[in-house]
């Protein structure tokens, strides 16, 4: 059976690596240089990096040059997210050499564009489904974006390759992942799912690992690593067991 992929996260705001609580602007804790953080995860054995431009996600500017520098310095696979919602931002993201990009808000506000991008770029495109209950939330999690399962059915029919599922109520809280939500999404699609939000312990990662046969492919880990709840080495060992 394939093992759960771990994607340590580097979220960038105003040029700094930060973590938010519930994805809310103003709740951030700063952790210094994004490049240093990314290189630390790489040297600890990560196979993926989840790199997010929070300013672009919130529409408060961007960190495009810095994001490109970090992505370019990596020998591992990079998943890029944040504010990718038109041809220009998508081209800039793909130009970094990242393995894939996550579309968020754009998928909710411009469905025709997303269908075109999925058709053109295939598995380089993942769609972020940011959920509160069964309602999707767009643009930096401040707007409603429709029903999760209706959107999932539409994206499936358009050939979307994978989904990154975040329970906003859990994100940045260290309260544990929403395993029920992950199960429900996996039951509704045959595409792989990457879990995001709430991972607080090695037991949480082991619990997500048990969902690999149901369709969970990976887990994004952020605050727990920065808060030193466990090391990345310990996490990689836990999901390999």
From Swiss-Prot:
<keyword id="KW-0963">Cytoplasm</keyword>
<comment type="pathway">
    <text>Amino-acid biosynthesis; L-tryptophan biosynthesis; L-tryptophan from chorismate: step 3/5.</text>
</comment>
<dbReference type="InterPro" id="IPR013785">
    <property type="entry name" value="Aldolase_TIM"/>
</dbReference>
<keyword id="KW-0368">Histidine biosynthesis</keyword>
<comment type="pathway">
    <text>Amino-acid biosynthesis; L-histidine biosynthesis; L-histidine from 5-phospho-alpha-D-ribose 1-diphosphate: step 4/9.</text>
</comment>
<dbReference type="InterPro" id="IPR006062">
    <property type="entry name" value="His_biosynth"/>
</dbReference>
<dbReference type="GO" id="GO:0004640">
    <property type="term" value="F:phosphoribosylanthranilate isomerase activity"/>
</dbReference>
<dbReference type="InterPro" id="IPR011060">
    <property type="entry name" value="RibuloseP-bd_barrel"/>
</dbReference>
<dbReference type="Pfam" id="PF00977">
    <property type="entry name" value="His_biosynth"/>
</dbReference>
<keyword id="KW-0822">Tryptophan biosynthesis</keyword>
<dbReference type="GO" id="GO:0003949">
    <property type="term" value="F:1-(5-phosphoribosyl)-5-[(5-phosphoribosylamino)methylideneamino]imidazole-4-carboxamide isomerase activity"/>
</dbReference>
<dbReference type="InterPro" id="IPR010188">
    <property type="entry name" value="HisA/PriA_Actinobacteria"/>
</dbReference>
<comment type="similarity">
    <text>Belongs to the HisA/HisF family.</text>
</comment>
<keyword id="KW-0057">Aromatic amino acid biosynthesis</keyword>
<feature type="active site" description="Proton acceptor">
    <location>
        <position position="11"/>
    </location>
</feature>
<dbReference type="InterPro" id="IPR023016">
    <property type="entry name" value="Isoase_HisA-like_bact"/>
</dbReference>
<protein>
    <recommendedName>
        <fullName>Phosphoribosyl isomerase A</fullName>
        <ecNumber>5.3.1.16</ecNumber>
        <ecNumber>5.3.1.24</ecNumber>
    </recommendedName>
</protein>
<dbReference type="GO" id="GO:0000162">
    <property type="term" value="P:L-tryptophan biosynthetic process"/>
</dbReference>
<dbReference type="GO" id="GO:0005737">
    <property type="term" value="C:cytoplasm"/>
</dbReference>
<feature type="active site" description="Proton donor">
    <location>
        <position position="130"/>
    </location>
</feature>
<comment type="function">
    <text>Involved in both the histidine and tryptophan biosynthetic pathways.</text>
</comment>
<keyword id="KW-0028">Amino-acid biosynthesis</keyword>
<dbReference type="InterPro" id="IPR044524">
    <property type="entry name" value="Isoase_HisA-like"/>
</dbReference>
<dbReference type="GO" id="GO:0000105">
    <property type="term" value="P:L-histidine biosynthetic process"/>
</dbReference>
<keyword id="KW-0413">Isomerase</keyword>
């Amino acid at each position: 059976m394939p093992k759960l992929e771990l994607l340590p996260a580097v979220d960038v705001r105003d040029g700094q690596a930060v973590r938010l609580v519930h994805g809310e602007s103003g709740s951030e804790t700063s952790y210094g240089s994004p490049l240093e953080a990314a290189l630390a995860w790489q040297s600890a054995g990560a196979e993926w990096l989840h790199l997010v431009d929070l300013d672009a996600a919130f529409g408060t500017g961007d960190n495009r040059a810095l994001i490109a520098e970090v992505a370019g310095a990596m020998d591992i696979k990079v998943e890029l997210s944040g504010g990718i919602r038109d041809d220009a931002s998508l081209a800039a993201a793909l130009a970094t050499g990242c393995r894939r990009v996550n579309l968020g808000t754009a998928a909710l506000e411009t469905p025709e564009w997303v269908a075109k991008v999925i058709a053109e770029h295939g598995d380089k495109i993942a769609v972020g489904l940011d959920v509160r209950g069964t309602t999707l939330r767009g643009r930096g999690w401040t707007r409603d974006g429709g029903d999760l399962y209706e959107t999932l059915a539409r994206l499936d029919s358009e050939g979307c390759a994978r989904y990154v599922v975040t329970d906003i109520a859990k994100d940045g809280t260290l309260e544990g992942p929403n395993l029920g939500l992950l199960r429900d999404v996996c039951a509704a699609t045959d595409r792989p799912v990457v879990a995001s939000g709430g991972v607080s312990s090695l037991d949480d990662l082991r619990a997500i690992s048990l969902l690999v046969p149901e369709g969970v492919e990976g887990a994004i880990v952020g605050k727990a690593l920065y808060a030193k709840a466990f090391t990345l080495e310990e996490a990689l060992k836990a999901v390999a067991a």
